[in-house]
């Protein structure tokens, strides 16, 4: 609210100053500027014209008055002439004129003052009425707002208190329920924790039992795998035996054909014998006559050879017999070749030998059956050796890779290839399984020797010594092959042994192969690592002699050949064809195993690159991948594949890569004692059994529990024989125990999952309870904040109401001051009216006295008096009209500004006791305000929207002397209402 002072609240000194200023401005007739609208401006222009016309009339009247004054002066001059008579009259006339002038001046001043006071009173009354209405409206609105706000506050407070009570009751009930649930959940959690502890203990026990069961399962898996390997080997052996049976049938047919050919030759021999008998008779006669010399004996031998009884022996170095001879008497042709050495008395033995040949064929068939039975009995030993071979193939390949890396040439690997070629040529098809066993034994011994040679070759750099060692190795391998062939022969297959006796000995006694293995392994363990090669060879030969096995001589193969050269070539061709077909089938089956080996090597390369960056290992892996692709494309052989694989594994062992929990540094790969077999590429079927099953799962199946520490013959075979002797009942019992353990484990896991789900549900419930508590706390906080906001708003309303009351009191004080001022002005107005009445009475008395005094005067003088009275009346009428015009102008100016200012709701209201002021007015005030009441319609009609926009127009015309002080008051009112309207 604007704090400017009210324009009517002024002191009496200011009022007198304003009155003097009005008088001065009237005298000076300076132009005054007021704020009016356009319509009012047009009306005022018309009024100005009328005022100008009236002013012209006034000037005319003043001129007339001047003329009259001149006339009076002349009359006075005339009267002076009559001094004696006119002194009294002149004095009275002068006093009357001066009194009249003074009264006229006072009357004009009082009239102007009265006009200003009446205008101020009118404006103040209008403003008071307007303010009374505005104050009443404001008070009514404030009261209604107070009542509404109080009602709203009461309603809101009641609703919020009810809501808060309800929320508190709900939250307290919820909190009680949640506390009960928390107690229940705590009890359940305690029970669950106890049950979980028990379950954890149970799980620990179950985990221990599970670990034990897993170890047993692993053991059983290993046994099952060994059994599967046995089954696979048995299948393969059955396949080999079927092939052998086919070969034996073909051999039988060939032996029948050879027997027929032998019979034919025997008939020819009989004929030749007859001739020889005749010749013998002739010779006897000659002997009787004369003993022949050496030249004659040589001629006789040449004649016998020319007859067809030559020696059919072949060197065993070029070709060995494919059929195992049981005795030197197996082949009749060997005896036919020595006919010249026998005397003529032994010719009858040839007939018996034919019968012996047929009996020998039958005995050979029975012997093959017995050998099959002995083969079935020895399959356990053979399977153990093959399993060990499969487990140590990786290590042997790493050793071969080390030998390749340490030796400048590939003589260490050319040696097994040569052995392979010689064994394919020397081993007969009928003894395939025996020769495989013997070859595996030879591999084991040769592998240990090769590892020791690789150890000894580190410190030797002379090429001549290496050449001699390679030659010695070749001779040693040749001798070992012959030795293993003899060791694989059963005891009953000697020259004069029967089949029943051989089978009984093979069942009762330990096989010579195992004895020979034990002796050779003991010899190799007893010898130091740096021992000479010749010493190792001598010790092995002594062990072979102690075992009772004689090494075959190189010229012994000629005595064992019982077939002709054509039959040997045919048999070798048939065996090579069978082997080629077997190799082709096995290579197709080996493709999966080779791919698994390749995947394992790629896994090793990834592990190696992750552990450390080694370029040599990556190069060897790349070489292995190229060889793998070459093997798949049949560009390279499996030998190259195995060599590259051994190099990769050696490099991986040097890098000490941990593969599937088995660290490579835990196994001593350089020790010759831990080598069981050497993976020689002798037979592709054996490679399938060793490498394909070895890398069936992508990694080695060997472990520390399966490999013995000393790796000798007894410790290598006896545990395997013991573990393989599982009965079906024990196996089924173990399966049942395994199933029970799995079921118990599954039930425990299910219980654990159920408890976990319960615990998760309780945790969810706790989380929900916590979230509900948080939401309740949040809602409680929101309610408190709302209450605080309501309290603050109530406080702000109270402060506002207090401010309004203060403003009301201030307005009341101002209104009281205005009332006092109005009362003072009314008293002054009354005094002025009383003075005016007194002056009028004096004028009337003067006028009455003047005719009495001027009766004596002449008629012209009376005429002048009459004219003066008429002029005075006209002057009074003009003054009245001027006053009315000034009042209208004064009433128009504040009324326009009052219309422009709209009543504001922020105006303070008056008390009901002060509202009666507008009605309680004096009767004199009502009389005085009667002229203004006549002007109210004009003021009401003067309202226009132009004034509301505060357009200020300047008036160029000068108003009357009584128009300045109301203009100041109107400007004060306009400033007040313009600021409130803004």
Curated annotation (Swiss-Prot):
Aminoacyl-tRNA synthetase recorded as keyword: no
Give residue spans, biased composition: Basic and acidic residues. 457-466
Q: Where is the composition biased (Polar residues)?
A: 423-433, 693-705, 896-910, 918-943
| Region spans: Disordered | 311-333, 423-466, 687-711, 896-982
Q: What Pfam families does the database record attribute to this sequence?
A: FPP
Query: Any idea which GO molecular function terms this record carries?
Result: microtubule binding
InterPro entries xref list: FPP_plant (IPR008587)
Per the record, the GO terms for biological process are: microtubule polymerization; trichome morphogenesis
Please list the coiled coil stretches: 39-83, 125-291, 345-401, 452-475, 722-885
The organism's superkingdom is given as: Eukaryota
The Low complexity compositionally biased stretches are 323-333
List, alphabetically, the SUPFAM superfamilies matched. Answer: Tropomyosin (SSF57997)
Which keywords accompany this UniProt record? Coiled coil
| Similarity comment | Belongs to the FPP family.
**Subunit structure as annotated in this protein's UniProt entry:** Interacts with WPP/MAF proteins.
- Record-given protein name: Filament-like plant protein 4
Q: Which organism is it from?
A: Arabidopsis thaliana (Mouse-ear cress)
